[in-house]
Amino acid sequence: MKITNSNKDAIICLAAGKSQEQIIIKAKSLGYIVVAIDRDQASPGFKYADIKICQSTYDADAIIRELEFLKNEYRWIGVLNRSSGPPVITAARICEYFEIPGISIESAQNLVNKDKLRESCLKYGIPSPAYKIYSTNERETVFSNKFPIVVKPALSLIGKSGISVARSENELKS
């Protein structure tokens, strides 16, 4: 579906927290209408946005439903997202639904899921560190006698969260 009937260029900003304030301010200074989306009604970026949507940035379907009400009033020209987690997928889904140029859903999923990211790097010849995908049940036998190791979840919600170093089997088990 192509958005028509509008001469108001609008940018969708996924999240309105402290780290998004400058993005919202800059978009406004460039003359764009800013639709800010955040689950926290007290998000500081909301005070700069033209339109505020209180919704989780993880819930693409709910956000798309909200944006549907606005699509005839504004021309969506971009989706901004400073996250490296699940909101990247939300941004891709919004872009696809409203035919806004942006990252593909597959690329977004590859970016968010570290296993998929490494597989994609390998497929396209992009160097990346050696890794092993394993389940919780396998980990004690797979890595025995190869310590220290770095353990990182495939789906980290915030940057480097969940990373740990195991120097022994006991540390790996805990």
Regions of interest found by a model, annotated:
Residues 1-107:
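ATP-binding N-terminal substructure of ATP-dependent carboxylate-amine bond-forming enzymes
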Residues 34, 102, 128, 149-150:
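Hydrophobic beta-strand scaffold residues
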Residues 52-58, 131-136, 164-167:
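Short acidic-hydrophobic, aromatic-tinged amphipathic segments that line or gate anion-handling sites
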Residues 62, 89, 141, 159-160:
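Glycine/Thr-rich phosphate-binding loops of Rossmann-like dinucleotide-binding domains
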Residues 96, 108-129, 136, 140-142:
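Glycine-/Pro-rich loop/turn segments that contact NAD(P) or position catalytic residues
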Residues 130-131, 148-174:
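Glycine-rich phosphate-binding loop of ATP-grasp-fold ATP-dependent ligases
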